[in-house]
Protein backbone atom coordinates (compact mmCIF):
# COMPACT_ATOMS: atom_id res chain seq x y z
CA UNK A 1 0.00 0.00 0.00
CA UNK A 2 2.95 2.33 0.58
CA UNK A 3 3.86 2.06 -3.10
CA UNK A 4 0.35 3.20 -4.00
CA UNK A 5 0.72 6.15 -1.64
CA UNK A 6 3.97 7.10 -3.37
CA UNK A 7 2.19 6.94 -6.73
CA UNK A 8 -0.69 9.07 -5.47
CA UNK A 9 1.70 11.67 -4.05
CA UNK A 10 3.63 11.80 -7.30
CA UNK A 11 0.42 12.18 -9.34
CA UNK A 12 -0.62 15.11 -7.16
CA UNK A 13 2.75 16.73 -7.87
CA UNK A 14 2.39 16.31 -11.63
CA UNK A 15 -1.23 17.49 -11.52
CA UNK A 16 -0.49 20.63 -9.56
CA UNK A 17 2.60 21.37 -11.68
CA UNK A 18 0.48 21.37 -14.82
CA UNK A 19 -2.38 23.35 -13.34
CA UNK A 20 -1.18 26.89 -14.12
CA UNK A 21 0.14 26.26 -17.61
CA UNK A 22 -1.15 27.80 -20.83
CA UNK A 23 -2.48 24.42 -21.97
CA UNK A 24 -4.41 23.94 -18.72
CA UNK A 25 -5.90 27.43 -18.97
CA UNK A 26 -7.07 26.79 -22.52
CA UNK A 27 -8.57 23.46 -21.49
CA UNK A 28 -10.50 25.11 -18.65
CA UNK A 29 -11.83 27.66 -21.16
CA UNK A 30 -12.95 24.88 -23.47
CA UNK A 31 -14.82 23.15 -20.65
CA UNK A 32 -16.38 26.33 -19.25
CA UNK A 33 -19.95 25.13 -19.83
CA UNK A 34 -19.26 21.93 -17.87
CA UNK A 35 -17.79 23.61 -14.80
CA UNK A 36 -19.63 24.86 -11.76
CA UNK A 37 -21.59 21.62 -11.43
CA UNK A 38 -20.89 18.21 -9.94
CA UNK A 39 -18.74 17.20 -6.99
CA UNK A 40 -15.30 16.65 -8.49
CA UNK A 41 -12.25 18.87 -8.12
CA UNK A 42 -10.49 20.08 -11.24
CA UNK A 43 -6.91 21.32 -11.47
CA UNK A 44 -6.62 24.90 -12.65
CA UNK A 45 -9.94 26.15 -11.28
CA UNK A 46 -11.87 26.29 -8.03
CA UNK A 47 -15.03 25.18 -9.84
CA UNK A 48 -16.30 21.61 -9.59
CA UNK A 49 -17.24 19.28 -12.44
CA UNK A 50 -19.02 16.00 -13.06
CA UNK A 51 -16.86 12.88 -13.01
CA UNK A 52 -16.25 12.48 -16.74
CA UNK A 53 -15.16 16.08 -17.26
CA UNK A 54 -12.94 15.96 -14.17
CA UNK A 55 -11.33 12.74 -15.37
CA UNK A 56 -10.53 14.23 -18.77
CA UNK A 57 -9.22 17.54 -17.46
CA UNK A 58 -7.12 16.09 -14.64
CA UNK A 59 -5.86 13.29 -16.87
CA UNK A 60 -4.67 15.90 -19.33
CA UNK A 61 -3.29 18.41 -16.85
CA UNK A 62 -1.29 15.78 -14.93
CA UNK A 63 0.60 14.88 -18.14
CA UNK A 64 1.41 18.45 -19.24
CA UNK A 65 4.49 18.95 -17.10
CA UNK A 66 6.07 15.57 -18.05
CA UNK A 67 6.61 14.65 -14.40
CA UNK A 68 4.22 11.68 -14.21
CA UNK A 69 5.30 8.13 -13.39
CA UNK A 70 6.31 5.36 -15.81
CA UNK A 71 5.96 1.60 -16.12
CA UNK A 72 9.25 0.98 -17.88
CA UNK A 73 8.54 -2.48 -19.28
CA UNK A 74 5.46 -1.23 -21.10
CA UNK A 75 6.61 2.28 -22.14
CA UNK A 76 3.52 3.50 -20.31
CA UNK A 77 2.53 6.28 -17.87
CA UNK A 78 -0.16 4.68 -15.66
CA UNK A 79 -0.91 7.49 -13.20
CA UNK A 80 -2.53 10.07 -15.47
CA UNK A 81 -5.29 7.89 -16.93
CA UNK A 82 -5.73 5.54 -13.98
CA UNK A 83 -5.64 7.89 -10.99
CA UNK A 84 -7.40 10.78 -12.73
CA UNK A 85 -10.39 8.57 -13.52
CA UNK A 86 -10.73 6.77 -10.21
CA UNK A 87 -9.96 9.90 -8.16
CA UNK A 88 -12.88 11.71 -9.79
CA UNK A 89 -15.15 8.74 -9.18
CA UNK A 90 -14.03 8.38 -5.56
CA UNK A 91 -14.54 12.07 -4.87
CA UNK A 92 -18.01 12.04 -6.40
CA UNK A 93 -18.96 9.09 -4.18
CA UNK A 94 -17.30 10.53 -1.05
CA UNK A 95 -15.13 7.42 -0.90
CA UNK A 96 -12.10 6.76 1.29
CA UNK A 97 -8.46 7.18 0.38
CA UNK A 98 -7.86 3.55 1.34
CA UNK A 99 -10.47 2.38 -1.18
CA UNK A 100 -8.97 4.69 -3.79
CA UNK A 101 -5.49 3.25 -3.21
CA UNK A 102 -6.78 -0.32 -3.57
CA UNK A 103 -8.51 0.60 -6.83
CA UNK A 104 -5.32 2.23 -8.09
CA UNK A 105 -3.37 -0.97 -7.43
CA UNK A 106 -5.87 -2.94 -9.52
CA UNK A 107 -5.84 -0.40 -12.34
CA UNK A 108 -2.06 -0.31 -12.43
CA UNK A 109 -1.86 -4.12 -12.43
CA UNK A 110 -4.29 -4.70 -15.28
CA UNK A 111 -2.98 -1.98 -17.55
CA UNK A 112 0.74 -2.50 -16.95
CA UNK A 113 0.40 -6.19 -17.75
CA UNK A 114 -1.29 -5.36 -21.04
CA UNK A 115 1.29 -2.69 -21.85
CA UNK A 116 4.17 -5.11 -21.40
CA UNK A 117 2.96 -7.87 -23.73
CA UNK A 118 2.25 -5.59 -26.71
CA UNK A 119 5.71 -4.02 -26.82
CA UNK A 120 8.01 -3.11 -28.44
CA UNK A 121 6.11 -2.87 -31.73
CA UNK A 122 3.14 -1.02 -30.24
CA UNK A 123 5.32 1.98 -29.37
CA UNK A 124 6.42 2.45 -32.97
CA UNK A 125 3.19 4.28 -33.78
CA UNK A 126 1.07 4.46 -30.64
CA UNK A 127 1.22 6.42 -27.39
CA UNK A 128 0.79 3.63 -24.86
CA UNK A 129 -0.54 6.00 -22.20
CA UNK A 130 -3.47 6.85 -24.45
CA UNK A 131 -4.14 3.33 -25.68
CA UNK A 132 -3.49 1.12 -22.65
CA UNK A 133 -4.53 3.87 -20.26
CA UNK A 134 -8.18 3.09 -20.98
CA UNK A 135 -7.72 -0.31 -19.30
CA UNK A 136 -6.11 1.20 -16.20
CA UNK A 137 -8.98 3.65 -15.80
CA UNK A 138 -11.65 1.04 -16.48
CA UNK A 139 -10.15 -1.54 -14.11
CA UNK A 140 -9.68 0.92 -11.26
CA UNK A 141 -13.19 2.33 -11.62
CA UNK A 142 -14.68 -1.15 -11.89
CA UNK A 143 -13.06 -2.07 -8.59
CA UNK A 144 -14.24 1.11 -6.89
CA UNK A 145 -17.80 0.52 -8.12
CA UNK A 146 -17.73 -3.09 -6.91
CA UNK A 147 -18.53 -4.56 -10.32
CA UNK A 148 -18.65 -8.34 -10.61
CA UNK A 149 -16.34 -10.23 -12.98
CA UNK A 150 -18.73 -10.14 -15.93
CA UNK A 151 -19.36 -6.42 -15.54
CA UNK A 152 -15.64 -5.70 -15.19
CA UNK A 153 -15.01 -7.67 -18.37
CA UNK A 154 -17.65 -5.58 -20.13
CA UNK A 155 -16.01 -2.39 -18.86
CA UNK A 156 -12.53 -3.39 -20.01
CA UNK A 157 -13.65 -4.61 -23.42
CA UNK A 158 -15.74 -1.50 -24.02
CA UNK A 159 -12.88 0.75 -22.98
CA UNK A 160 -10.48 -1.06 -25.29
CA UNK A 161 -12.51 -0.23 -28.37
CA UNK A 162 -11.87 3.46 -27.71
CA UNK A 163 -8.09 3.11 -27.26
CA UNK A 164 -6.22 5.80 -29.15
CA UNK A 165 -3.16 8.03 -29.21
CA UNK A 166 -0.68 8.40 -32.07
CA UNK A 167 3.05 8.99 -31.77
CA UNK A 168 2.84 11.82 -34.29
CA UNK A 169 1.58 14.00 -31.44
CA UNK A 170 5.14 13.83 -30.03
CA UNK A 171 6.71 15.02 -33.26
CA UNK A 172 5.55 18.63 -33.20
CA UNK A 173 4.98 21.36 -30.65
CA UNK A 174 1.29 20.80 -30.01
CA UNK A 175 -0.95 20.46 -26.96
CA UNK A 176 -2.43 17.17 -28.17
CA UNK A 177 -0.16 14.68 -26.40
CA UNK A 178 -1.36 15.30 -22.82
CA UNK A 179 -4.96 14.92 -23.97
CA UNK A 180 -4.27 11.26 -24.72
CA UNK A 181 -4.30 10.21 -21.04
CA UNK A 182 -7.16 12.63 -20.44
CA UNK A 183 -9.21 10.84 -23.07
CA UNK A 184 -8.16 7.46 -21.68
CA UNK A 185 -9.26 8.47 -18.18
CA UNK A 186 -12.66 9.62 -19.41
CA UNK A 187 -13.16 6.57 -21.64
CA UNK A 188 -12.22 4.10 -18.91
CA UNK A 189 -14.43 5.78 -16.33
CA UNK A 190 -17.35 5.90 -18.76
CA UNK A 191 -16.86 2.23 -19.69
CA UNK A 192 -17.12 1.20 -16.03
CA UNK A 193 -20.24 3.31 -15.50
CA UNK A 194 -22.06 1.94 -18.55
CA UNK A 195 -21.02 -1.61 -17.63
CA UNK A 196 -22.57 -1.06 -14.21
CA UNK A 197 -25.77 -0.07 -16.01
CA UNK A 198 -25.73 -3.29 -18.04
CA UNK A 199 -24.04 -2.31 -21.30
CA UNK A 200 -22.14 -5.33 -22.58
CA UNK A 201 -18.74 -5.52 -24.25
CA UNK A 202 -16.79 -7.90 -26.48
CA UNK A 203 -15.06 -10.54 -24.30
CA UNK A 204 -12.32 -11.33 -26.84
CA UNK A 205 -11.48 -7.68 -27.46
CA UNK A 206 -7.79 -8.19 -26.66
CA UNK A 207 -6.99 -11.36 -28.61
CA UNK A 208 -9.70 -11.38 -31.30
CA UNK A 209 -8.81 -11.43 -35.00
CA UNK A 210 -9.86 -7.79 -35.34
CA UNK A 211 -9.14 -6.88 -31.75
CA UNK A 212 -6.79 -4.67 -29.80
CA UNK A 213 -3.69 -6.82 -30.20
CA UNK A 214 -4.17 -7.51 -33.90
CA UNK A 215 -4.69 -3.84 -34.67
CA UNK A 216 -2.09 -2.25 -32.41
CA UNK A 217 0.80 -4.70 -32.09
CA UNK A 218 2.84 -6.88 -34.42
CA UNK A 219 3.48 -9.58 -31.83
CA UNK A 220 1.14 -9.48 -28.81
CA UNK A 221 2.22 -12.14 -26.32
CA UNK A 222 -1.07 -12.85 -24.59
CA UNK A 223 0.35 -16.09 -23.19
CA UNK A 224 2.55 -13.93 -20.91
CA UNK A 225 -0.31 -11.80 -19.59
CA UNK A 226 -0.73 -13.73 -16.33
CA UNK A 227 2.91 -14.60 -15.64
CA UNK A 228 3.72 -14.36 -11.91
CA UNK A 229 0.22 -13.12 -11.17
CA UNK A 230 -0.23 -12.74 -7.43
CA UNK A 231 3.48 -12.93 -6.60
CA UNK A 232 3.94 -9.16 -6.60
CA UNK A 233 2.19 -6.03 -7.77
CA UNK A 234 3.46 -3.94 -10.65
CA UNK A 235 2.81 -0.75 -8.71
CA UNK A 236 5.88 -1.83 -6.72
CA UNK A 237 7.95 -1.57 -9.90
CA UNK A 238 7.13 1.94 -11.08
CA UNK A 239 9.58 4.57 -12.26
CA UNK A 240 9.23 8.00 -10.72
CA UNK A 241 10.68 10.77 -12.85
CA UNK A 242 13.65 12.67 -11.50
CA UNK A 243 13.73 15.12 -14.42
CA UNK A 244 11.01 17.25 -15.99
CA UNK A 245 11.25 16.00 -19.54
CA UNK A 246 10.70 12.98 -21.75
CA UNK A 247 11.98 9.83 -20.04
CA UNK A 248 14.02 8.84 -23.07
CA UNK A 249 16.43 11.65 -22.14
CA UNK A 250 16.96 10.33 -18.63
CA UNK A 251 19.76 7.78 -19.12
CA UNK A 252 21.97 10.35 -20.83
CA UNK A 253 21.18 13.00 -18.20
CA UNK A 254 21.96 10.53 -15.42
CA UNK A 255 25.21 9.50 -17.11
CA UNK A 256 26.24 13.15 -17.36
CA UNK A 257 25.35 13.63 -13.68
CA UNK A 258 27.61 10.72 -12.79
CA UNK A 259 30.50 12.21 -14.77
CA UNK A 260 30.00 15.68 -13.30
CA UNK A 261 30.12 14.23 -9.80
CA UNK A 262 33.33 12.32 -10.49
CA UNK A 263 35.34 14.69 -12.68
CA UNK A 264 36.25 18.41 -12.91
CA UNK A 265 34.10 19.20 -15.96
CA UNK A 266 33.32 22.78 -16.97
CA UNK A 267 31.22 23.54 -20.04
CA UNK A 268 33.74 25.94 -21.58
CA UNK A 269 36.38 23.18 -21.58
CA UNK A 270 34.23 20.57 -23.35
CA UNK A 271 35.14 19.68 -26.93
CA UNK A 272 32.41 17.10 -27.60
CA UNK A 273 29.70 15.08 -25.83
CA UNK A 274 29.02 11.71 -27.44
CA UNK A 275 25.80 9.94 -26.50
CA UNK A 276 24.96 6.38 -27.47
CA UNK A 277 21.30 5.52 -26.97
CA UNK A 278 18.41 3.41 -28.17
CA UNK A 279 16.33 4.25 -31.21
CA UNK A 280 13.41 5.95 -29.42
CA UNK A 281 15.83 8.51 -28.02
CA UNK A 282 16.72 9.77 -31.48
CA UNK A 283 13.18 9.47 -32.86
CA UNK A 284 11.34 11.15 -29.99
CA UNK A 285 13.95 13.45 -28.43
CA UNK A 286 15.01 14.95 -31.73
CA UNK A 287 14.85 18.72 -31.27
CA UNK A 288 18.06 20.76 -31.41
CA UNK A 289 18.07 24.37 -30.18
CA UNK A 290 14.43 24.13 -29.06
CA UNK A 291 12.35 27.26 -29.22
CA UNK A 292 9.60 26.22 -26.79
CA UNK A 293 9.36 24.35 -23.51
CA UNK A 294 7.66 21.46 -25.29
CA UNK A 295 10.50 21.11 -27.78
CA UNK A 296 13.05 21.39 -24.98
CA UNK A 297 11.46 18.51 -23.09
CA UNK A 298 11.87 16.37 -26.19
CA UNK A 299 15.44 17.46 -26.91
CA UNK A 300 18.37 15.29 -25.90
CA UNK A 301 20.90 17.96 -26.85
CA UNK A 302 19.14 20.57 -24.73
CA UNK A 303 18.48 18.48 -21.62
CA UNK A 304 22.02 17.12 -21.50
CA UNK A 305 23.44 20.62 -21.95
CA UNK A 306 21.04 22.08 -19.39
CA UNK A 307 22.15 19.50 -16.84
CA UNK A 308 25.75 20.66 -17.26
CA UNK A 309 25.00 24.39 -17.21
CA UNK A 310 22.08 24.62 -14.76
CA UNK A 311 22.76 21.67 -12.49
CA UNK A 312 19.23 20.23 -12.72
CA UNK A 313 16.64 19.46 -15.38
CA UNK A 314 13.50 20.39 -13.49
CA UNK A 315 10.98 23.17 -14.11
CA UNK A 316 13.47 26.07 -14.21
CA UNK A 317 15.27 24.40 -17.11
CA UNK A 318 12.24 25.03 -19.32
CA UNK A 319 11.58 28.68 -18.53
CA UNK A 320 12.20 31.36 -21.14
CA UNK A 321 15.51 32.53 -19.69
CA UNK A 322 16.88 28.98 -19.75
CA UNK A 323 15.76 28.45 -23.34
CA UNK A 324 17.62 31.65 -24.25
CA UNK A 325 20.77 30.70 -22.33
CA UNK A 326 23.70 31.13 -24.73
CA UNK A 327 25.92 28.73 -22.80
CA UNK A 328 23.36 25.94 -23.22
CA UNK A 329 22.90 26.89 -26.88
CA UNK A 330 26.63 26.64 -27.58
CA UNK A 331 26.98 23.36 -25.72
CA UNK A 332 24.17 21.77 -27.73
CA UNK A 333 26.30 22.02 -30.86
CA UNK A 334 28.85 19.76 -29.17
CA UNK A 335 26.38 16.92 -28.49
CA UNK A 336 26.50 14.01 -30.92
CA UNK A 337 23.86 11.27 -30.68
CA UNK A 338 24.26 7.85 -32.23
CA UNK A 339 22.29 4.62 -32.01
CA UNK A 340 24.05 2.11 -29.78
CA UNK A 341 23.11 -1.49 -30.54
CA UNK A 342 23.55 -2.71 -26.98
CA UNK A 343 21.25 0.01 -25.65
CA UNK A 344 18.76 -0.68 -28.44
CA UNK A 345 18.67 -4.40 -27.69
CA UNK A 346 17.90 -3.74 -24.01
CA UNK A 347 14.93 -1.45 -24.74
CA UNK A 348 12.24 -1.28 -23.36
CA UNK A 349 13.18 -3.39 -20.32
CA UNK A 350 16.24 -1.23 -19.69
CA UNK A 351 16.63 2.44 -20.65
CA UNK A 352 20.37 2.94 -20.96
CA UNK A 353 22.91 5.31 -22.46
CA UNK A 354 26.65 5.50 -23.03
CA UNK A 355 28.14 8.96 -22.65
CA UNK A 356 31.64 10.19 -23.41
CA UNK A 357 32.67 13.76 -22.64
CA UNK A 358 35.83 14.76 -24.46
CA UNK A 359 37.64 17.79 -23.08
CA UNK A 360 39.65 20.29 -25.09
CA UNK A 361 42.86 18.97 -23.53
CA UNK A 362 42.13 15.54 -25.06
CA UNK A 363 41.00 13.76 -21.90
CA UNK A 364 37.84 11.66 -22.19
CA UNK A 365 35.42 10.80 -19.38
CA UNK A 366 33.02 7.93 -20.06
CA UNK A 367 30.10 6.35 -18.25
CA UNK A 368 27.63 3.61 -19.18
CA UNK A 369 24.29 4.34 -17.48
CA UNK A 370 22.54 0.96 -17.35
CA UNK A 371 19.26 2.29 -16.00
CA UNK A 372 17.56 5.55 -15.07
CA UNK A 373 17.70 6.95 -11.58
CA UNK A 374 14.10 6.48 -10.49
CA UNK A 375 13.66 3.13 -12.22
CA UNK A 376 12.75 0.08 -10.07
CA UNK A 377 16.38 -1.07 -9.94
CA UNK A 378 17.56 2.41 -8.86
CA UNK A 379 14.47 3.90 -7.19
CA UNK A 380 13.97 7.35 -5.77
CA UNK A 381 13.89 7.29 -1.99
CA UNK A 382 10.83 8.60 -0.17
CA UNK A 383 12.83 11.72 0.63
CA UNK A 384 13.79 12.27 -3.02
CA UNK A 385 10.16 11.79 -4.04
CA UNK A 386 9.07 14.21 -1.36
CA UNK A 387 11.67 16.80 -2.42
CA UNK A 388 10.36 16.59 -5.99
CA UNK A 389 6.76 16.98 -4.81
CA UNK A 390 7.58 20.02 -2.68
CA UNK A 391 9.53 21.65 -5.51
CA UNK A 392 6.58 21.22 -7.90
CA UNK A 393 3.76 22.19 -5.56
CA UNK A 394 5.06 24.78 -3.10
CA UNK A 395 5.13 27.68 -5.62
CA UNK A 396 1.52 26.93 -6.56
CA UNK A 397 -0.33 25.95 -3.39
CA UNK A 398 2.05 27.18 -0.71
CA UNK A 399 4.47 25.44 1.61
CA UNK A 400 1.89 24.65 4.28
CA UNK A 401 -0.58 22.93 1.96
CA UNK A 402 2.19 21.00 0.21
CA UNK A 403 3.48 19.81 3.58
CA UNK A 404 0.02 18.71 4.73
CA UNK A 405 -0.68 16.74 1.54
CA UNK A 406 2.66 14.94 1.70
CA UNK A 407 2.27 14.14 5.38
CA UNK A 408 -1.24 12.82 4.90
CA UNK A 409 -0.26 10.56 2.02
CA UNK A 410 3.13 9.27 3.11
CA UNK A 411 2.13 9.27 6.77
CA UNK A 412 -1.07 7.28 6.21
CA UNK A 413 -3.16 10.13 7.62
CA UNK A 414 -5.53 10.86 4.72
CA UNK A 415 -9.01 9.40 5.11
CA UNK A 416 -11.58 10.90 2.74
CA UNK A 417 -10.79 11.74 -0.89
CA UNK A 418 -12.92 14.89 -0.67
CA UNK A 419 -10.90 16.16 2.26
CA UNK A 420 -7.67 15.42 0.39
CA UNK A 421 -8.90 17.26 -2.71
CA UNK A 422 -9.77 20.34 -0.67
CA UNK A 423 -6.08 20.78 0.10
CA UNK A 424 -5.23 21.58 -3.52
CA UNK A 425 -8.43 22.24 -5.50
CA UNK A 426 -8.95 25.84 -4.37
CA UNK A 427 -5.31 26.79 -4.89
CA UNK A 428 -4.08 25.08 -8.07
CA UNK A 429 -4.94 27.94 -10.40
Indicate residue ranges for each PLM-predicted region.
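Hydrophobic alpha-helical hairpins/lids featuring a short glycine-rich hinge
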Residues: 61-116
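Active-site nucleophile and cofactor-binding loops and adjacent substrate-binding regions
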Residues: 74-80, 99-104, 122-134, 179-183, ...
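Active-site cavity-forming subdomains of large catalytic enzyme subunits
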Residues: 93-99, 116-125, 138-155, 166-178, ...
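Terminal-appendage/accessory-domain detector
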Residues: 1-75, 176-186, 193-429
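Secretory-pathway/luminal and periplasmic proteins that interact with or process carbohydrate-rich
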Residues: 18, 36-38, 110-118, 162-170, ...
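Well-ordered alpha-helical segments within folded domains of soluble proteins
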Residues: 80-87, 133-140, 186-190, 249-251
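Acidic helix/loop microenvironments that form the catalytic cleft of cell-wall polysaccharide enzymes
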Residues: 156-164, 274-277
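Extended, well-ordered alpha-helical scaffold segments
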Residues: 3, 30, 98-110, 150-158, ...
Amino acid sequence: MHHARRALLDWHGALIAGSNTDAANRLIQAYAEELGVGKCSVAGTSQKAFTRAAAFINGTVSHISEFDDIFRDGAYHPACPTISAVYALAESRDDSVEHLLAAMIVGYEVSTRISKVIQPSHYEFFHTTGTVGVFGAAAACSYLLGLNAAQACDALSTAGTFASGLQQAFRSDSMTKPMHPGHAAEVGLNAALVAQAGMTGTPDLLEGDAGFGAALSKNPRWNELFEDLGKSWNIEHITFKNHGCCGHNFPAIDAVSHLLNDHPIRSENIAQIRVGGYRATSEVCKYVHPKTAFEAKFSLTYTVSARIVLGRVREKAFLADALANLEIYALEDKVVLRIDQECTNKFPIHRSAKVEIEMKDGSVYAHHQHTRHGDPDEPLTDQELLDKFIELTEPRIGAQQAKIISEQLLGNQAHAVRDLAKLWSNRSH
